[in-house]
């Protein structure tokens, strides 16, 4: 593979490995933005913005929005929206269960539509947010237990002879991870307290998710595929961030937006159904002395890329995809269409992204679900219910979506980063006669 792909995907693998969930995604993105000279804003304070300024704001520690103010009066917003959550098991409170006075297992629940069997028989750990009582103040501390801590063991075939005929796994009875012997009871709480630098009694509440400890890597005879956890949607997050940091602001405001809870419907204060994006765009408008009419004009001259990975043709199940629109790893950015509006792409936004990709020399692929399969939806159509702007759903073709270990193409990371860079530097205008311009 070309060196550019190799270097970029080495960075992607490192990003995947240090990003076990949405809290760490935002933490890691903040660090990159700060290193690039961005200033952090707070939602609970007034914003003072300047031409040429670079800023970011977060919500709940699990969603983030970054933007750059152009030197001149801006035309609209170029919004790249993606999500940083992935299907996983979430640890319940009072999680420890002692079995036969011999084992300690943990009580967990599903987060999102996961492939359950992929969580069996592999090293797991836990990461997330811990709320601690420190001198009467609640402090949120991020914890990642970076060791092979637990496993969900399969039932041996000798005890389940029908295993290879298909097993229906029950999340409550079959998927509880083994963390230690009975002698280790209360050990997880002590481990978390040590990681937080507090006593176990100071831990008030937690939001902790299991994750696969297997590091991301590249595979294939030519190392043409990247494999790892949470490629959906961290591959789009990573590529979008690279394009955002490399872009020069044009006539519109480039906006890099990372949302949470897409895998469970986006209906949270930090999800696409909330007002996070809308609030930020309105505050940018107000902080620069523009009125409501200016804001509405800007929305009419805006475009959003809703970036979320797509299904590649599976080599063992080629009949699961559309008859004439097939997508493959390493063959370009995917543009998604849906007659039922599960995806936001229409003829206008689809044409605009085609012009943009041609200008950036980035190949595109088209995706439709089979006509007899419902398929999934993305954050795009949810976001546009809050901010009504032209939008196109894109992504990268991947295999094993919602597995704990997924697979995609190494070239596509670079393709999307290049497209994102061109997108952030561009501007879209709609004329009175109904024609559109890409600047």
Enumerate the predicted regions with their spans.
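N-terminal hydrophobic/helix-forming segments and targeting peptides
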Residues: 1-439
């Amino acid at each position: 593979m070309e060196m550019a792909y190799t270097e970029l995907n080495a960075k992607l693998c490192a990003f995947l490995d240090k990003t076990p969930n949405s809290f760490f995604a935002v933490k890691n993105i903040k660090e990159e933005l700060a290193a690039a000279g961005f200033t952090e804003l707070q939602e609970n304070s007034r914003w003072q913005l300047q031409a040429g300024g670079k800023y970011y704001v977060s919500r709940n520690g699990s969603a983030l929005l970054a933007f750059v103010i152009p030197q001149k009066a801006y035309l609209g917003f170029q919004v790249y929206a993606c999500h940083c959550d992935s299907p996983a098991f979430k640890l319940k409170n009072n999680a420890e269960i002692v079995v036969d006075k011999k084992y300690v297992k943990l009580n967990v629940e599903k987060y999102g539509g996961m492939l359950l069997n992929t969580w069996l028989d592999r090293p797991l750990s836990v990461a997330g947010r811990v709320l601690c009582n420190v001198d009467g103040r609640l402090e949120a501390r991020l914890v990642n237990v970076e060791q092979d801590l637990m496993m969900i063991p399969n039932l041996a075939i000798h005890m389940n002879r029908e295993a290879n005929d298909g097993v229906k796994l029950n999340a409550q009875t079959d998927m509880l991870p083994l963390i230690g012997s009975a002698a280790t009871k209360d050990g997880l709480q002590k481990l978390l307290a040590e990681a937080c630098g507090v006593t176990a009694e100071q831990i008030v509440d937690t939001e902790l998710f299991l994750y696969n400890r297997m590091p991301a890597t590249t595979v294939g005879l030519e190392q043409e595929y990247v494999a790892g956890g949470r490629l959906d949607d961290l591959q789009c997050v990573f590529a979008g961030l690279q394009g955002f940091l490399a872009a020069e602001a044009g006539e519109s405001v480039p906006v890099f937006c990372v949302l949470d809870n897409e895998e469970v419907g986006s209906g949270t204060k930090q999800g696409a159904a909330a007002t996070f994006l809308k609030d930020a765009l309105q505050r940018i408008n107000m902080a620069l002395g523009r009125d409501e009419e200016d804001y509405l004009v800007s929305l009419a001259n805006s475009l959003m890329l809703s970036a979320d990975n797509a299904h590649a043709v599976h080599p063992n199940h080629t009949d699961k995809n559309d008859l004439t629109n097939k997508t493959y790893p390493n063959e370009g950015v995917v543009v998604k269409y849906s007659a039922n509006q599960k995806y936001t792409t229409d003829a206008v936004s689809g044409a605009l992204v085609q012009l943009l990709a041609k200008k950036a020399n980035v190949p595109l692929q088209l995706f439709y679900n089979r006509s007899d399969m419902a398929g999934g939806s993305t954050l795009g159509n949810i976001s546009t219910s809050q901010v009504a702007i032209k939008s196109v759903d894109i992504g990268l073709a991947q295999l094993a979506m919602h597995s704990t270990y997924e697979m995609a193409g190494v070239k596509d990371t670079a393709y999307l980063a290049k497209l994102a860079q061109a997108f952030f530097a561009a501007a879209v205008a709609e004329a009175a006669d109904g024609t559109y311009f890409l600047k």
